Amino acid sequence: MTGGETPPFSLAVIADAHFHDIAGDYGLPGVPAGERRLTLYSWARTRESTRVFNESAAALSAALEQVAARGIRHVVLLGDYTDDGQRRTTESLARLLTRQEEEHGLRFYALPGNHDVFGPFGRHRSGDFLRADGRSVLVTSDGREPPPGAVVTPDFRCEGLPAGLLPMARFGYFRRPEFLHWETPFGLNDAPEARSYEAVSADGRTRHRLMDASYLVEPEDGLWLMMIDANVFEPRNGVFKPRSKRAFIDSTAAGWNAMLRLKPFILTWMADVAARAKATGKTLLTFSHYPVIDPLDDREGYEPRLFPGGTILKRRPEPAVAEAVSKAGIDLHFSGHWHVAGQSRRGDLVNVAVPSLCGYPPGFCVVEAKGVAVAVETVDLSALPLDADIMALYGREAARTGGGSDAVSGARDYGEFLRLHTQALVRHRYFPREWPAEVVSAIEGMRLSDLLADERTRPAGDVPPGCDADEAVIALIADWYCLRQGGALALAGLGERRIALLEQLARLYAETPEASTDRAIAAYLGLFFRAGLFHLERARGPAWPAA
């Protein structure tokens, strides 16, 4: 950069913070921990969720500390900034962000994810929280038929649009005097009633006016942030009570596939914004919660063969999405939702998948941009310390319930904790929901030496000496998931020995026929470990820009 050149714009992008206020008041007294009383989700609930709950607030605070220390002022919140859109949680987050504005001069630009709002009317939410004795108690906003002992509070309800945005109003959703420019797909009016569109069910029988929360903001001269509300709450076929959550299809799996059908006006607006940005020399960055290209870049089709009913397949954007977004003049898009770190390309369009703060691997992105020149750095938060009180309470819960703590209480840092959480997910979520039952039954308690010797599971080729490590198979499967989600970040997190073991297994199973019927379990494992080799090659690829 010469002395007369202006520096590039800098901003941080934080996805899927899933903020839960561990000091929040949800109608129960909380668990004593030193001088604190903590409102904590149970470990039994956490190990079945793709995110951790009780560590989210500390991770967000640490991320914002790093942002401020780097001298970055602008922060994009890429959706799912709350735990589950609960009223009290959203209000607590808004207070935290306001303090960050006042103390560090940060400015936040939010867009909604599927966990932040629901349709026009909202929905009830529930969660299992710890008691002091290690048992759990249900907290719910639904008071219709609560189970005995449940805590019922309206503060746990997830709001709809626009009510769910109002606590976060100052963070981009509505105009602020200091913005150099601000608009929506509907014009310059920021009133919710001026930002609605008609959503129609597939059978044409149900119609709703829904708010779209998209906006374009110019926070400093020359920088345009296009914030896309890619939540789609499609009315269901049939007739429902107007305020029933069953009246709308959940936005979780809809994403951009549904955007093309139900919100095509967004693509028209995007094209107009992109053309104006080019004509006026603005640096345009585009964001939405949902990816426009498969973040795993699974061109070989491993996911549909391994997990045909899995969530990844349901959420994958169709090729038409990338075509439409690229046609609108967008060549760079940032997404969250999948809790994946990495990038994927289709033609000139690049999708940057920003990792979650509360899933493996934990991190956020720092972007430097000027014109068409963009640099993206992914900041790894694995080295963050753990809250000793929370770890001790997980141990107390395990001792009380006999359910085990999945070894997380022995984690040395946040990254190791999330890796062990991934291993718990394999046992408590992925195995029962996505894996063939006969495969799980065969391998669940195996060591690697068993896997390579058992007639049902051994690879087709000869096993070389020294490959019978005394490693739990479930730990290796968890490593596979960490590699899939983490890409390059997982290489350092898993370490050379574990990466080498995964690579060796993939090559051992390379000769196992996928279509084998007499050894179907081995065939499935062969496909699984070959997919791991694909994820490994992707992780070792160029970090930026996409090839």
Write out the residue ranges for each language-model feature.
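Active-site-proximal beta-strand elements of phosphoester/diester hydrolases
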Residues: 8-21, 223-232, 236, 350-355, ...
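Conserved beta-sheet core of the metallophosphoesterase superfamily
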Residues: 110, 302-378
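Extended active-site neighborhood of metal-dependent phosphoesterases/phosphodiesterases
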Residues: 92-261, 265-268
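N-terminal active-site segment of His-dependent metallophosphoesterases
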Residues: 1-90
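Non-catalytic terminal accessory segments
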Residues: 1-9, 267, 276, 299, ...
